[in-house]
From Swiss-Prot:
Can bind G- and F-actin in a 1:1 ratio of cofilin to actin. It is a major component of intranuclear and cytoplasmic actin rods. Interacts with the subcortical maternal complex (SCMC) via interaction with TLE6 and NLRP5. Interacts with C9orf72. Widely distributed in various tissues. The keyword Nucleus applies. The lineage of its organism: Eukaryota, Metazoa, Chordata, Craniata, Vertebrata. This is Cofilin-1. CDD domains: ADF_cofilin_like. It comes from Sus scrofa. Binds to F-actin and exhibits pH-sensitive F-actin depolymerizing activity. In conjunction with the subcortical maternal complex (SCMC), plays an essential role for zygotes to progress beyond the first embryonic cell divisions via regulation of actin dynamics. Required for the centralization of the mitotic spindle and symmetric division of zygotes. Plays a role in the regulation of cell morphology and cytoskeletal organization in epithelial cells.
């Protein structure tokens, strides 16, 4: 069921910037987004970038010690969100980076919000082409343990996430 909600150009631009890892200067790398939240506009007609809800690559190791824990704290208690998280992880063979699409729908979110976000999920996923991993979570218990995300990224082959052993 489609909701008729449109995906803003800003969302697509952020996604493309996060997806493309072209050779960049160290300053450009620092400005790249590590994690972002997307929300519905006030009129509920567009999916937009949520102001101030982002982690930059340059913040990691500076103002952000653990980007995954910081990301989890950005999720609202009582409303839904979409998110993109640029996961850095290690398997037994190599280090990897992958974008993860996250649909956050906490159980205490208003029913109308859950319905609009759920019915708009396909619209945003169609615009974010090439995402290999998706995580849907309905409570903090499902996201606060980094093993949940590691499971989506590669199961038991993943040995660390964001430099923290599992």
């Amino acid at each position: 069921m489609a909701s008729g909600v449109a995906v803003s150009d800003g969302v697509i631009k952020v996604f493309n910037d996060m997806k493309v890892r072209k050779s960049s200067t160290p300053e450009e790398v620092k400005k790249r987004k590590k994690a972002v939240l997307f929300c519905l506009s006030e009129d509920k007609k567009n999916i937009i970038l949520e102001e101030g809800k982002e982690i930059l690559v340059g913040d990691v190791g500076q103002t952000v010690d653990d980007p995954y824990a910081t990301f989890v704290k950005m999720l609202p208690d009582k409303d839904c969100r979409y998110a993109l998280y640029d996961a850095t992880y290690e398997t037994k063979e190599s280090k990897k980076e992958d974008l993860v699409f996250i649909f956050w729908a906490p159980e205490c979110a208003p029913l109308k919000s859950k319905m609009i976000y759920a019915s708009s999920k396909d619209a945003i996923k169609k615009k974010l082409t090439g995402i290999k991993h998706e995580l849907q979570a309905n409570c903090y218990e499902e996201v606060k343990d980094r093993c949940t995300l590691a499971e989506k990224l590669g199961g038991s082959a993943v040995i660390s996430l964001e430099g923290k052993p599992l």
